[in-house]
Each structure stands twice: as C-alpha cells, then as structure tokens.
A protein has these predicted regions:
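Surface-exposed extracytoplasmic segments
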Residues: 34-501
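Residue-level detector of alpha-helical transmembrane segments in integral membrane proteins
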Residues: 10, 23-26, 218, 310
Length: 501
C-alpha cells in the first residue's frame, strides 16, 4: 500500500512531510553535557543514566520474509565504555521501561509494551584458607549458554502488553518461559564468540490478543548505532557544513548501548486494516521516592515507593536535545504527547536557522514565521501520508510510521530517507534515490537524521525567496548507512568487546 498523495495540494503536503525533520534539530550550542540523539539531553536525566533513553527507531521490518512485521528499538544507558567493568551496565530493577503505540491520533497510548528487569546474584565463592569467600568479579570463567555456572549475576526480564491507558488498561503477560538478557561483552576470553552467544537470547514470543504470528524480542548490549560528528557539532559547528559528508569521525563508533528490540506483527499494532499509520515513543519511569538504606544489600540497596513517575521520553530524534529550551527539558521528559501544545513555540519559531546564519553569515535563515508547516507534521502528521487520525488529530510529538509503505531492502536504502523523493519541495516519487520508507516516515538505523534535519531546517522545501540557503547540502560530515547494520533481526551490531584493547 502506497501513501495516497494527490497532486492537488502536493506542495503543502510534501513540505509538511519534510518539515517534520526540522522540528528535530533546533540548536547546537551546548548548555548542559549533551550527547547524540537524546543522550544526557536534560539536566535531571544526567543523574540517572540507567533510565536515559538515547534513541528510538520504528520501521517496517526489512529482513527477507518479515514484511508483515514492524521492528521497534528503544536504546538506553548512553556512552557505555566497552571496558566498563566490573559491574558493567545492568538495567534498573526499580524502573519501568515502556514502548507506547498510538493508533487513533489522540496523543494517548492505545498499546504499551512494558519491560521490568531483575538481577539475581548467584554469590559465587572460592575457597581461601578453608573459607568460602565471595568473589568480587562478574564472572569466574568463560561464559556460554543462557545459565552458565561461571556467571555471578544473571539478568532476567518480563514483558507485558497493556491495552488502553498505561496505568489503567488491561495488562497481560507476553508469554515465554524465562526471558533472559545476555551478559555485556566483557571480552574475548570471557565470551569468545559474543554474537553467537547473544543470538541465543533472541526469543519468539506470543502476544495475547495479537493475530498475525509470533513476535520476537531481544534485550541486550549493542554497538551504538547513532552517528554524528559530536565534538565539532557542539563546538559552534566547528566544521565545514558544505564539505564532504564523510570527512569526519563518528565518535560514537567507540561505545555501546543497551537495546530493547521488539518485532511485532503489523496487524497487532493497527486500529484496523484501513488505518495503517501508527505513532510510537519510548519512556522510562521511576517510583516517586527512593530512600538510601543505611545497610544496603545487593537485593535491596534502596527503598522505593509512590506512583510511577516518568523521567525519560523519546519519540522523534533530537527533540529534547536540540529543540526544547533548557528551562523545559526536564518538563518535556515528564510530559505526555497529548500535552505537547505547551512546547509549540519551539517549533513555530525555530532557533537553529538563525544560529547557523550567525555562525555562517552567507547561509541566510528562512524568513517565514510562524512555521505552521512544521506544526502540521511535527504535531499532527501529514494528511494521506502519516497522519493517524483523518479528522481531527490531537497535536502530539511522536515518531509516525505508515505501515502500508513497503520496506526498502537494506541494499537499496538511501540514508537521506525520503529526501530524494522531493524536487524543490514537490513530491516526485520517481526521482532517482527516492526512498519513502525512510525518516521521517518512521526511522531506520541507517537514516542520516542529522544531515536531513540540517538541510530542512535551512529551508530545503521553501521557495528561494524565503529560504536563500534552502538548496545547500548541509552536513555534519559524519555519515552512516544501512551497510553499517545487519539485514536481519535484531539489526544492530554486536557490542564492542572490553578486551583485548
């Protein structure tokens, strides 16, 4: 199924489709320590890295034979040094990690997938002078299989589906005996063939009330998939914005991240067969209170209580990092899409083009205000393309995906997503390189969201009289593509090993 785009009103609609990207990259000057798509992007979340959502992907599965599925990837715990032992990167057992789906366009979740984690200490000991002494390390020998006797701490998780409100809806357990998370990639001596080991933790799951076949889930450490010329970008764009797209190094290539990866039949996510568009986002929540125990144990280092309180939120990439003002970043992380009109000024009057013009006077910023085209797509979706509700959608920020647009095979994906589907703002599906299955119609790992948003922010879709620099090929000079990733589930590459260095 292809998007139903008539030529009448094509300019308005294609501008809106492209403009969704502009709302995702609206500042570059550092105020707090900020990293990548949504890494350490708000003051409060820097204090709690285990619940820091870093990237969110949602796309039609392009593994051969999986055309009827959608893959969702929620990444957490940024900037993991591969050698980050001895405790490495457990998920927070006192946190609630969630993936939300809106299939009605009201800005409220209709489906929620909930992940809860549990860390179990085996308390391995060795004999020392006639006494059994607990070891200080994560493992005491090579690791293989799901329950190796040499592993000191095992991490398991549960997966539930909630239909309706996340706290008030009908909650059911996704069935699978013993969902386990693979140990982080300690090193080659501990885990000689990590990817073979990790793939044994890909689980087929049966989702209650979900037709269309079994789903798949994998939770574990992966190599950081996001790519950006980070240092220079935040240093007042200390690079050549019209230079080679691949001239600089992607510094994130040296770190890992923890991924919650879920593949679900499309039919499970849709309101009905005639409504193919969904919106999605990920959140993490903690209990309202956390009290330090004066005598902590491994199982109970703190006492937590109170209602679940959202502390991290991520839909469209770069929004809280580079759109929202510092004074509202923590509020955005705690907010729900249905309440997003409170942040509309950050989209209608974007600051990035003005700041780029300040740094590069020849690059004139667009002069059209307010940017109502951005509001249409950033908050409501584009009619006949990726708008969920066809009548009166609630303005709400989330990543929208038209599941009716066929996935592009990995070998034919364009890292500029839908960019080359437009010529001077006019939708041209037969234009060379056109890839309508890419960002901002969902997001795949190989989509170069930074270059896309830079160009659109400077007016790629606007007339030259309004956007004199709109046709310039802006870039952060760090690039990537689908070739960096696997062509099969879970798509993201194995994490970097802690050893040897």
């Amino acid at each position: 199924m292809r998007p139903r785009l008539s030529r009448s009103g094509a300019r308005t609609r294609c501008v809106a489709l492209w403009a969704v990207a502009v709302g995702t990259l609206l500042w570059v000057l550092p105020v707090t320590p900020a990293m990548a798509s949504s890494h350490r992007e708000a003051p409060l979340i820097t204090q709690m890295p285990k619940v820091d959502g870093t990237d969110w992907y949602m796309f039609n599965s392009y593994e051969p034979g999986r055309e009827a599925y959608v893959t969702m990837i929620a990444n957490y715990q940024p900037l993991q040094a591969p050698y980050g032992g001895p405790n490495y990167f457990f998920m927070d057992p006192d946190a609630l990690y969630e993936i939300h789906i809106d299939n009605t366009g009201d800005g409220k979740e209709d489906l929620t997938f909930q992940f809860r984690f549990k860390n179990e200490l085996d308390n391995l000991t060795v004999p020392v002078g006639g006494k059994a002494i607990s070891v200080p390390l994560f493992n005491i020998g090579p690791i293989s299989g799901p329950t190796p006797p040499t592993l000191n701490i095992e991490e398991t998780y549960t997966l539930d589906i909630v239909r309706g409100g996340r706290r008030s809806g009908n909650q059911q357990r996704v069935t699978h005996a013993g969902l386990r998370k693979p140990t982080d990639n300690i090193g080659e001596k501990s885990i000689p063939n990590y990817e073979t080991y990790a793939r044994s933790f890909i689980h087929d799951v049966s989702i209650p009330g979900c037709d269309g076949g079994q789903g798949r889930v994998f939770v574990g450490q992966r190599r950081e998939p996001f790519f950006i010329n980070l240092g220079e970008f935040f240093d007042l764009i200390n690079l050549d914005p019209l230079g080679s797209p691949s001239a600089k190094r992607n510094i994130l290539n040296d770190v890992n991240v923890t991924s919650l990866i879920l593949e679900v039949p499309k039919s499970c996510l849709l309101r009905n067969a005639s409504s193919p568009v969904i919106g999605g986002w990920t959140t993490a929540s903690l209990r309202q209170s956390r009290i330090l125990r004066p005598h902590p144990t491994f199982a109970n280092p703190t006492t937590v209580g109170g209602a679940w309180t959202q502390v991290s939120r991520l839909g469209m990439p770069l929004v809280n990092e580079l759109v929202i003002g510092v004074k509202d970043k923590d509020q955005f992380n705690a907010s729900k899409p249905e309440d997003d009109t409170q942040f509309a000024d950050y989209v209608t009057h974007p600051s990035l083009p003005v700041l780029i013009e300040t740094l590069f006077p020849a690059a004139k910023a667009p002069t059209q205000f307010p940017r109502t085209d951005l509001v249409a797509v950033f908050l409501t979706g584009v009619d006949d393309v990726n708008q969920i509700s066809e009548s009166n959608p609630t303005p709400s920020e989330m990543l929208r995906l038209n599941t009716g647009i066929p996935a592009t095979p990995a070998a034919h994906q364009n890292n500029l997503g839908a960019a080359l589907c437009f010529v001077h703002g006019v939708l041209t599906l037969k234009h060379p390189g056109c890839d309508p299955a890419g960002f901002p119609n969902g997001r795949r790992p190989g989509d170069d969201i930074v270059d896309i948003t830079l160009r659109v922010a400077m007016g790629y879709l606007l007339p030259l009289a309004i956007a004199p620099a709109g046709q310039l090929p802006f870039t952060d000079q760090a690039t990537g593509s689908a070739a960096m990733f696997d062509t099969h589930f879970p798509y993201l590459k194995a994490p970097l090993a802690g050893s040897p260095q």
